Amino acid sequence: MRVLALSAVFLVASIIGMPAVAKEWQENKSWNAHFTEHKSQGVVVLWNENKQQGFTNNLKRANQAFLPASTFKIPNSLIALDLGVVKDEHQVFKWDGQTRDIATWNRDHNLITAMKYSVVPVYQEFARQIGEARMSKMLHAFDYGNEDISGNVDSFWLDGGIRISATEQISFLRKLYHNKLHVSERSQRIVKQAMLTEANGDYIIRAKTGYSTRIEPKIGWWVGWVELDDNVWFFAMNMDMPTSDGLGLRQAITKEVLKQEKIIP
């Protein structure tokens, strides 16, 4: 059984706005070394589902809200499925023929591949078909971040008013994992399938990356969870990312923390 082997002396604090089930969060500043090593700043938040405990390296930043960027593909997918904008994970979305800088976008996709390759144009079309009224209603039902969809309906998560913190990401993900969001269990199951990132004999990771570039500060995200035989660990990390050169650090730093705490080998 994997137990969190926290190697530092913890500061226990109650923080308003963190997941309602969490009365005490523990801070481990030793995790900061993983950011310092890569000359960056950021936060990692972990949640032990069995013990109902939260851990982070930076309590203040854990509660600071940023644009969700492409992590918003998780709620966008759920809403599109539940409203029938997307029939299922097999429906094909035809490439519009416009050549874009990211080569993997320049082809047909289904929900699984659109999530995997973070295909913005596909998700913008989802949002346009969902519309402002239904999008706003669903995000309120999800209690997703500040629920503010001001800006364009097909880009508010990239350059509009919506903001979400790492701890709020954890709250949302926990509801998704337990099929407790206000959409069908089928919709939640399909999205969790689309989030599959890594699977081996030790663990399964379901997650989504994000990279906010249109509004300063530019932020990189990785949010999701680690499924073990006897527990689930939720995670949400964001970090300063002035250029795209460090995109791989989102996963690398998170995994360094998970390994430090002996959650993954």
UniProtKB/Swiss-Prot annotation:
GO terms for molecular function: beta-lactamase activity; penicillin binding. Residues 1-22 form the signal peptide. One of its GO terms (biological process) is antibiotic catabolic process. Carboxylated on the epsilon-amino group of a lysine, with the resulting carbamate functional group serving as a general base. Probably N-carboxylated at Lys-73 at neutral pH in vivo and undergoes complete N-decarboxylation, at pH 4.1, in vitro. GO terms for cellular component: plasma membrane. The modification N6-carboxylysine is found at residue 73. Pfam families: Transpeptidase (PF00905). The active site is at 70 (acyl-ester intermediate). The keyword Hydrolase applies. Induction: Expressed from an upstream promoter, P(out), in an insertion sequence IS1999. Its EC number is 3.5.2.6. Keywords: Antibiotic resistance, Hydrolase, Plasmid, Signal. Belongs to the class-D beta-lactamase family. Monomer. Dimer. When OXA-48 is present in clinical isolates of K.pneumoniae, increasing chloride concentration during antibiotic treatment reduces bacterial growth. This is Beta-lactamase OXA-48.
